[in-house]
Amino acid sequence: MASGKEIKTKIASVQSTQKITKAMEMVATSKMRKTQDRMAASRPYSETIRNVISHVSKASIGYKHPFLMEREVKTVGMLVVSTDRGMCGGLNINLFKAVLNEIKKWKEQGVTVEVGVIGAKGIAFFRSLGFKIRAQHSGIGDNPSVEELLGIANDMFDAYKEDKIDALYLAHNQFINTMSQKPSVAQLVPLPELDTDNLDERQQVWDYLYEPEPKVLLDNLLTRYLESQVYQSVVDNLASEQAARMVAMKAATDNAGNLINDLQLVYNKARQASITNELNEIVAGAAAI
């Protein structure tokens, strides 16, 4: 059995770790709430642009943007949004599994897959598997802006415009609630047609006067919308990351507490055994006299 001093040292070490995990839990909770606010603030913007795009594209303007045109799929692009840091449970692994399943399905159909990756964890993962990474970006921090994501987003959009890829999918962790996040893999371009069945009659009137020309307006709207979708997925993934980290750190803090209790019990037993030995030695010494 370890000595009382050794056990005390272990208890102090675990208590120190417990303080760190508790602090990380509190920080993650604060960051998650701030990210949720940003996520809620950006969603109406994306939804409004999406509706306007649907209206403009259905007008008789004699123009079809490449982002709205289906074509034969020979090469697929996959833009994966991961985290820069770890200690967030199985968040990244679950996303990577979902992405690899999608890639497997495409390859079984004879389709080539190229990836673009946001986040250091994703870059390291796909590089280790030998994937060709068309574009990458890391170090986005806790408060990303649309501007800093434009580089990787435009790289993937340009690949589609230049027929280097025939479809682009966006993969990220979708924030459901504090205890639940799920991987999401959705088609980004060609843009899926908006379901207008639930719109009222006023919203389905397409006869508008456009300024500037509908073509210019549609080009700009599509670009802004796709950029907002990439931003939205990054913010969504950040909220998922902080929620997963909060849960992981809470579990670590609770486990540290249980370990401290177990070590304290061992320490008490060791101390009891030490006191018993001392008493036995005293009694034996008295008997010898």
UniProtKB/Swiss-Prot annotation:
This is ATP synthase gamma chain. Coiled coil: none annotated. HAMAP family: ATP_synth_gamma_bact. GO terms for molecular function: ATP binding; proton-transporting ATP synthase activity, rotational mechanism. One of its GO terms (cellular component) is proton-transporting ATP synthase complex. It comes from Actinobacillus succinogenes (strain ATCC 55618 / DSM 22257 / CCUG 43843 / 130Z). Pfam families: ATP-synt. The lineage of its organism: Bacteria, Pseudomonadati, Pseudomonadota, Gammaproteobacteria, Pasteurellales. Keywords: ATP synthesis, Cell inner membrane, Cell membrane, CF(1), Hydrogen ion transport, Ion transport, Membrane, Transport.
